Each structure stands twice: as C-alpha cells, then as structure tokens.
From Swiss-Prot:
Source species of the chain: Bipolaris victoriae (strain FI3) (Victoria blight of oats agent)
Similarity comment: Belongs to the peptidase S28 family.
Active site: 174, 451
UniProt-recorded name of the protein: Serine protease vicPb
Enzyme class: hydrolase
Xref: Pfam families: Peptidase_S28 (PF05577)
The gene coding this protein: vicPb
Domain of life per record: Eukaryota
Keyword vocabulary terms for this entry: Glycoprotein, Hydrolase, Protease, Serine protease, Signal, Virulence
Pathway annotation from the record: Mycotoxin biosynthesis
Amino acid sequence: MLRYLLIPILYLQVVLGVLSEVLPSLKPSVVPKNTSLLSGRGVFRQLIDHTHPEVGTFSQKYWFNTTYWGGPGSPIIFYTPGQHPATNRLYYLTDTTLPGLIAKEVRGAVVLVEHRYFGESQPFDNLSTSNLQYLALDQVLADFVHFARTVELPFDLSGNSHPLRTPWIWVGNSYSATLVAWTERLFPNTFWAYYASGAAVNSMQDFWQFNYPTQQGMPQSCRSNLEAIISHVDNVFLSGSPEQKQELKIRFGLQDLSLLEDTAYALSQPIIGWTLIQPSDTHTQFSEMCNAIENANFSSSRRDFGSKTNFQTVLDNYADWFKTSYLPRLCERPNYSGWTGRNSVQCLDTVNLSSQAFHDLSVQNDDRVWDWIACNYFFFWQTGSPIDTPTIFSRLIDPVYYERRCRLIFPKEGNATYGIAAGVTDKSMNALTGGWNRTGKRILFTNGEFDPWRSASVSSVFRPDGPMQSTSQQPIILIKGVQHQADMYVRNRINKEVREAMDTGIAQISRWVLDFYTENSKTLAHDLQGFCVH
C-alpha cells in the first residue's frame, strides 16, 4: 500500500512546493546573474508520420533558455520560429522578445522547437514532391503536441515539466501564431494557454483584403499615387500595344521578364514592405519608396495627405526608385547560375522552366518549403482588389497566377501531389479549423490596426459579423497605429500602445499560469483524498 501512496504524495508535495513559490509572486526575487543567450540545445526523435509511426523518425532540433526558470514544475514558454531556420531566430529565447519576457515574469524556461523541413530538422535528404507529403498541417501540429507530451528536457529530468504537471504556454507570431490558433482548435488539452500575435485564422486563396490595412495606414498621398501607378500598369498590360508593354517593362528594368503577370507582380512587391515596419524603426524601405515617389519626406508612421504631384513625374519617380534601389541584388544568389547579376530578375520569372528555382531540391531551399506550405494548406495569396475597389496590388495577379506556379514547382510524382491539386480549398480549410468562427479557451489574440494580416484575423473588418469581441477565455487586443507582430519585440515598448498591449497580455498569461497551479492543486488534493479513503 505504501508504495502506491508514495507517488501521489510526493507529486502533491512537488506541486504544492511550486505553488508556494509561484503564488506569492510570479517574478523572481533576484534577477539571475546568468544572462547568456542560450542554456543549451537538444535533439528530439520526432515521428515522420504521426498516423503511421512505422515510417520512422527524424531529428527535430530544439533550444532552451533556463535563465529565469524556477525549477521543476515551473512554466514552459514554448515557441517555434515557423518558416525560419531556428538558428536565425534564437533571440526569441531571450527577454528582448515576448517569449523571454513572459518567462521572466512567470519564472519559466523558454523552449524553442524548429518546424519540420526547416533548418536542421529535415525528415529527408531532398525536397521532392514525394518527400514533401509529410509537410501537412496535421503532421506539423502533431509534432509540437508530441514533443510537449514526450520530450525529456535536459534541464529537468524529474519529469515535472510534463504538460500534466506544469503549464506549457505557446507564444507565436505571424505563421507560428496561426499554428497556435489551429492547435488550440484541433489539438486541445496539451498546452495550457496560448498567445497569438498577428494570427491569420480564416484561410483565403484570393486574399485581396491584404491590401486594405496598408491603404488605411500609409501616407494617403502616397496611397493615391500608388493606386494610380498600378492602375496605369494594369491598363497598359491589358490593353496597350506590344510596344507600350515593352516600353513599360524597360522603364522598370524588367525587360527580361516574358510574362506580363510576372512584371505586374514585381511592381506590386514593394507594397508588402509595409508589413515589416516596426514602431522602433527610424528608416524603412517603404517610407523610402513614398519619399522617392513624391520627392517628399514621410516618416514610416506618417499618414497625412501630402501635396499632389503630376502623374508622369510620379511614374518616373517610382520607376527610378524601383530600378536603382529596389531591384538591384533582389534576385542575386551566388549558388544559382544565372542569378549572379546585380540586376537579375530570375527570382521573378515563373515561366523559365530551366531556372534553378524549379529544380533545387536541396533541404536548404527554404523558399521551396514555404511554397509547398502555401500550395498545400496555407494559401493567403496576395492579389489585386476587385474592380470596384481601389488597389495597390496589380489585378493581373489572381489565384490562378499562384496555382500555375504550384503546378510548375511541384510536378506530380505517382499519386504524390500538393493540397490544392488534391482538392484542398480555403473553404475546406476553414471547415477544418473554424476560420473566423471560433470559441477559444485560454487563448489571447493581438493584432495591429494597420497589419495587412489583420484582414484574415479575428479582428478583421471583413469578418461577416464584424471584428470578434473579446471574452475572458479569448481576449482580443487591437493595437492602434501599428503593423505586424509589434508586441513581440521589447524594443517596440517605446510605443505606448504596444507597451500597454504587452503588459496586458503578460498579465493575462500570468493569471492563467496561476489558474493552472490552483486548479491542479485542488484536483490533486481531491484525488489523493479519494485514494486514501479507498
């Protein structure tokens, strides 16, 4: 009898010990002296196919930082860098970013796990269509759940960092925030709470709404001029003479592109730079573009109207800036033959089937992996707005443009193909994930007011019932005046709106952490009482 009682009694002592440490204050009483970037790294043997374990395993890499960790039973702050090799995103382990800041607040350890098929976490030695079959949404989400449930963390061999014994908090931004939201929906009951910054939750193949927040937030005279430029480009490419079309391509340095849609796409690309602007930035490529167009001096945050400029001058200014500042070295890639010229346009050419972009199956080709994700289950293709809506993205770019590229990059190999070719659509994805219709539990969403990704988020103005309302179990914070994932970086705390959002979010996560220990102490006490009676 004693040996059966010993385990629950010791477990209760551990949890109550953690409670006594955590409940009075979630902040460490003394800031640890160890401020090194990393505490260590590990290798996890991950299943290639979670429905067929016999397929085998691969080495999934992870890193951890225990600078603020309070010991066994203390929280785990979980993060994945999504579509980036982990070695390029290890700063997310530190308190210069939100995961590290939360860890500091709740005395947690940060654990960063690399996404399958990126960086060093490769199931196969090449990225053929057949090998990419295991890069599917269910496999990706199952990776992180399986990791949390079964990993033996090197810094806690006691086993008390299991999700049943300690709260695992998943923090994500951008694509990884979408994974956060979809995990909460499809794989609940492993992670205790979630923080999703800039999560696109409603799948869209024709994502023209991406443009809207940019149009609302950018300097309005720059917006008007860009709308006029894109309208002119579309008119020339749709109804101009062959000479006029070629002249326009030459003006922008894009004469080597044979497909008009590729040229239109290239001329629309600088607009996407709006997404990257952070409140702490003092100079951005986007503001540089607007300044060049109007010979003005806009800051990255200014949104007022400027003076009107003659359209021909505006067009010439944009062409000069594009050709001399944006295009040079855009496509330069030394390891690809033909891509070494300063003004190469090879990365923009989607019809040159001899291009190495179509044949590079090496596991270092992150662009191919991301293309697969987009073609398989993620979508969110930026397109031109409907004809009755002003656009800053060419209307020549529609879902067909992207789907054609999917077919060329990922030829069918036997029965192996990508999601869209197999019948996956945005509608089927939303039926699976819930899209805009969701009722979450202990998940916090944040979105920037002028973030293009807001249009697919819970705060979207395009949501049929309007932006989703915040609840106690699913708090939603709209950060005024900022773009994408601004609350992920401590340097952005210079912005009042970002600072308040971060403080509110961290306080909410802290309360949920306390809830875990409170609820689990009651459950353990009840279970132990029942066990002793019997």
